């Protein structure tokens, strides 16, 4: 697997830290989750905004890190939902990021479970969890990584299987790509 996006349901800072670390250890191209659009367009016209971003992500190649969209001045924009939809539509593995400082293992486990349910509802695949600011022992069935990330984390992520769910938008993008190739 080579395409990832960080989704941090509770902390834009955790998303930024995890994204920076992933970009450093993976050494892949980055593409913005709002490439070619704005948060306002994404909130008000997602049916036209999302396909444009999917095309930009696919143009970046199979080895890419999508820099996640974050909170915006337009409060109608749900950055978590956008990032999960983009992950599903581009077959990017979701790396959940949480600020673990001062959080109990029980609370983090509940937050991870809730975020995974939300990802599943969007047809996105969670491939790992990144914790910032401490690392309580967690019992989850995906790799749990802590900052700073090293080569072992990169190898773990590269070894994950690519998501296989096919959303209507991913199917459409596949057809367009094949038509252009012919």
Spans of features found by a protein language model:
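ATP-dependent carboxylate-amine ligase catalytic core
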Residues: 1-128, 133-143, 148-182
């Amino acid at each position: 697997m080579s395409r990832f996006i960080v989704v941090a349901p509770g902390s834009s800072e955790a998303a930024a830290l995890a994204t920076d670390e992933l970009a450093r250890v993976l050494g892949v191209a980055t593409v913005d989750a709002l490439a070619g659009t704005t948060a306002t367009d994404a909130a008000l016209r997602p049916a036209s905004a999302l396909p444009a971003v999917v095309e930009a992500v696919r143009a970046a190649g199979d080895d890419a890190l999508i820099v996640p969209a974050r909170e915006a001045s337009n409060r109608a924009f749900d950055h978590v939902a956008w990032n999960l939809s983009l992950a599903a539509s581009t077959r990017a593995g979701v790396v959940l990021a949480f600020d673990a400082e001062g959080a109990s293992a029980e609370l983090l486990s509940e937050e991870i479970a809730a975020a995974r349910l939300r990802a599943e509802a969007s047809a996105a695949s969670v491939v790992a969890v990144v914790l910032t600011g401490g690392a309580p022992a967690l019992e989850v069935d995906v790799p749990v990584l802590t900052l700073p990330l090293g080569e072992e984390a990169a190898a773990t992520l590269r070894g994950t299987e690519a998501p296989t769910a096919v959303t209507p938008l991913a199917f459409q993008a596949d057809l367009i790509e094949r038509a252009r190739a012919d």
